[in-house]
């Protein structure tokens, strides 16, 4: 059994189509100034025909495998964090497994909404450290724009689509996930949800007419819960790793809303120049937001070998998750 699970590969994929705030001005009653002031978003990527969850996940997964220098046949486990699967079943991870060529590898989905990447990172790391898996391909992908009411300016301006992936392998040196704090409050499940389409409320013509197949969220309440839980779980994760915010080279938060990111950074007493932000170009990509940010942080050399990074997220459920990782790749 390994002491640690190092991140040896990473990759991302986003749709080709870019939807700007100027485009949205022509679709709903809104403005670039209104959107940027309230969210910090300038544009987002929108999935088109053929750019479904498995397709983006396969593209991100292939990029991560190439970076790790692994053949897909060496992967023994494929995990996908998503709440927008290709279809109710089978698990979309099985489609990803076949698509990347990881023949006969174990494959399963996990659902933790926007917290999915950190939740899945804990699962993947535990499998590697326990010896249950050796080479894990972990992908996070969501296509929320298929569940958006494009007449609702409060939600249609927020979301974008994308996928991010990492490869985890055993390591005897301190690397990868050092600590992780997961949490949820199911009593707040209705603050953000898609009501129709499950076994509680199967999609019927009447529910579709009511728009119950679209994302609903109580933004004001989400803001309060998000800032509180992201900050609290971040401090807990740092304490579990024996570190303080001063030891962290970079904070990589879930890219939901610039106001949430700024308020969380303030509670953590971390200057914004040590907080990675790219939601201005991608919007809220749900579970994919942290791995996409991670890939770009590495590309921009804001995360280097030996650095500690704090990942923190919050999502529907309500769920939250924070983790400390040590970057070991050169």
Curated annotation (Swiss-Prot):
Signal peptide: none annotated. Keywords: Acyltransferase, Cytoplasm, Fatty acid biosynthesis, Fatty acid metabolism, Lipid biosynthesis, Lipid metabolism, Multifunctional enzyme, Transferase. The active site is at residues 114, 254, 284. Its EC number is 2.3.1.180. Residues 255-259 are annotated as: ACP-binding. GO terms for biological process: fatty acid biosynthetic process; secondary metabolite biosynthetic process. Coiled coil: none annotated. One of its GO terms (cellular component) is cytoplasm. InterPro entries: ACP_syn_III_C, ACP_syn_III_N, FabH, Thiolase-like. Pathway: Lipid metabolism; fatty acid biosynthesis. GO terms for molecular function: 3-oxoacyl-[acyl-carrier-protein] synthase activity; beta-ketoacyl-acyl-carrier-protein synthase III activity. It catalyses: malonyl-[ACP] + acetyl-CoA + H(+) = 3-oxobutanoyl-[ACP] + CO2 + CoA. It is found in: Cytoplasm. The keyword Acyltransferase applies. Gene3D superfamilies: 3.40.47.10. Belongs to the thiolase-like superfamily. FabH family. Catalyzes the condensation reaction of fatty acid synthesis by the addition to an acyl acceptor of two carbons from malonyl-ACP. Catalyzes the first condensation reaction which initiates fatty acid synthesis and may therefore play a role in governing the total rate of fatty acid production. Possesses both acetoacetyl-ACP synthase and acetyl transacylase activities. Its substrate specificity determines the biosynthesis of branched-chain and/or straight-chain of fatty acids. The last Arg residue of the ACP-binding site is essential for the weak association between ACP/AcpP and FabH. Homodimer. NCBIfam families: fabH, PRK09352.1. This is Beta-ketoacyl-[acyl-carrier-protein] synthase III. It comes from Roseiflexus castenholzii (strain DSM 13941 / HLO8). The gene is fabH.
């Amino acid at each position: 059994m390994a002491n640690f699970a190092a991140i040896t590969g990473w990759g991302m994929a986003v749709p080709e189509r870019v939807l700007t705030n100027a485009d949205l001005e022509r679709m709903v009653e809104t403005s670039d100034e209104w959107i940027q002031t309230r969210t910090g978003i300038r544009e987002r990527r929108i999935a088109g025909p053929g750019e479904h969850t498995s397709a983006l996940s396969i593209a991100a997964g292939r990029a991560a495998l190439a970076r790790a220098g692994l053949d897909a046949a060496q992967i023994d486990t494929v995990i996908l964090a998503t709440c927008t699967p290709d279809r109710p079943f089978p698990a979309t991870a099985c489609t990803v497994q076949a698509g990347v060529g990881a023949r006969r590898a174990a494959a399963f989905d996990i659902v933790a909404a926007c917290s999915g990447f950190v939740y899945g990172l804990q699962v993947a790391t535990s499998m590697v450290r326990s010896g249950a898996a050796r080479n894990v391909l972990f992908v996070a992908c969501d296509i929320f724009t298929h569940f958006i009411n494009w007449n609702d300016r409060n939600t249609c301006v927020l979301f974008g689509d994308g996928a991010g992936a990492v490869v985890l392998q055993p390591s005897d040196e301190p690397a990868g996930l050092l600590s992780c704090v997961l949490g949820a409050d199911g009593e707040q499940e209705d603050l953000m949800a898609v009501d129709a389409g499950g076994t509680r409320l199967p999609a019927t013509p009447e529910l579709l007419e009511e728009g119950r197949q679209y994302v609903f969220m109580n933004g004001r309440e989400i803001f309060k819960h998000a800032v509180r839980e992201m900050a609290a779980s971040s401090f807990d994760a740092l304490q579990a790793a024996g570190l303080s915010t001063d030891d962290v080279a970079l904070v990589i938060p879930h890219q939901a809303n610039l106001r949430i990111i700024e308020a969380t950074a303030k509670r953590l007493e971390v200057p914004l120049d040590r907080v990675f932000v790219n939601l201005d170009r991608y919007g809220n990509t749900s579970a994919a937001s942290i791995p996409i940010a991670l890939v770009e942080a590495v590309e921009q050399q804001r995360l280097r070998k030996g650095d500690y990074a704090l990942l923190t997220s919050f999502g529907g459920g309500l769920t939250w998750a924070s983790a400390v990782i040590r970057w070991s790749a050169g």
